[in-house]
Every structure is written in structure tokens, then in C-alpha cells.
């Protein structure tokens, strides 16, 4: 009986680790020359891989690809049409998530079911504010500036 639970737990862990790679199935890797070089020179960018794919819900998102990588997937139409300033801010925002290890906390909260609790959801929402502050620090742009561009 114990082997059943051990096997089930192992399968659950493998599934959740493999699910982190799902956004990359139809995404294409972005060459570093298309992104802001000064932001890619930062230490946080060493373990970040950038991709472009179909993601109509936001400009970009970052996810943890265990054990080492953070992947950032840009929306294809956003990446094609966005101004260089907006791309710079979004890259800095996603690097803020990587620097603060937000993707690991978010993955853990979702996989364990803790994301259902209001206190944890508030913590996850504050992560966006932290990443915005990091991007503002790196680029000098405030998030409100880009709301005028839409």
C-alpha cells in the first residue's frame, strides 16, 4: 500500500516538473541580439531564457523550468509591435521576477494548492509590484507610462 502512495507522489512530482516546460512546446527562442544588451548583462539574466509564443493573455510571463532555468515567453504580436522602451521594461520586469525567485514560489504555491488561500494570493499579487519596482529601477520608466501607449 505504501508503494502506491510513493509511486503516486513520484508521478505527481514528475508531471508538475514536466508541466513547467509546456509553454515551450510551440514557442521559439529569441536571439539575445533582439533584447536589451545592458539588461542581459546582469547576473539575473544568466539563467533566463527568452522565447516568443502565442500568449494573448499578457505581454509576457515567466515560469520556472526546473532545476535551473527561468523561461520568459513573450506574446508574438506584442513582441512584433512593441516599442523598444516597452520591451525594455517588460524584460526588466521579468528579470525582477527571476532575481526575486518569484517563479519558484508561484510554482510551489500552485502545485501544493496554497494558491487557493487569500493570504498566499495577496503575497503572489505583491510579487507583481516588486517586479514593477525592479523594472522601474533598471529602466527609469514607470508602469503607468505604458498604460498611455495602448
Residue spans of the language-model regions?
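Hydrophobic alpha-helical transmembrane segments
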Residues: 1-11
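Generic hydrophobic alpha-helical membrane-segment signal
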Residues: 4, 81-85, 120-123
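Alpha-helical transmembrane segments of multi-pass membrane proteins
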Residues: 9-16, 117-118
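Peri-catalytic and regulatory segments of divalent metal-dependent proteins
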Residues: 15-91, 95, 100
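Short helix/loop segments within enzyme catalytic domains
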Residues: 25-52, 118-150
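Short, hydrophobic secondary-structure boundary micro-motifs
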Residues: 61-62, 108, 145-148
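Alpha-helical membrane-targeting segments
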Residues: 64-66, 104-122
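Catalytic Zn2+-binding segment of zinc metalloproteases
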Residues: 92-111, 140-143
Amino acid at each position: 500500500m505504501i508503494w502506491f502512495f510513493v509511486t503516486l507522489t513520484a508521478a505527481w512530482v514528475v508531471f508538475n516538473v514536466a508541466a513547467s516546460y509546456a509553454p515551450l512546446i510551440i514557442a521559439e527562442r529569441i536571439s539575445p541580439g533582439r533584447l536589451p544588451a545592458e539588461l542581459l548583462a546582469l547576473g539575473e539574466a544568466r539563467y533566463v531564457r527568452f522565447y516568443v509564443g502565442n500568449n494573448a493573455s499578457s505581454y509576457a510571463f515567466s515560469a520556472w523550468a526546473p532545476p535551473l532555468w527561468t523561461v520568459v515567453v513573450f506574446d508574438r504580436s506584442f513582441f512584433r509591435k512593441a516599442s523598444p522602451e516597452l520591451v525594455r521594461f517588460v524584460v526588466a520586469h521579468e528579470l525582477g521576477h527571476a532575481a526575486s525567485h518569484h517563479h519558484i514560489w508561484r510554482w510551489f504555491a500552485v502545485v501544493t494548492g496554497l494558491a487557493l488561500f487569500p493570504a498566499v494570493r495577496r503575497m503572489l499579487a505583491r510579487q507583481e509590484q516588486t517586479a514593477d519596482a525592479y523594472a522601474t529601477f533598471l529602466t527609469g520608466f514607470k508602469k503607468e507610462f505604458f498604460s498611455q501607449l495602448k
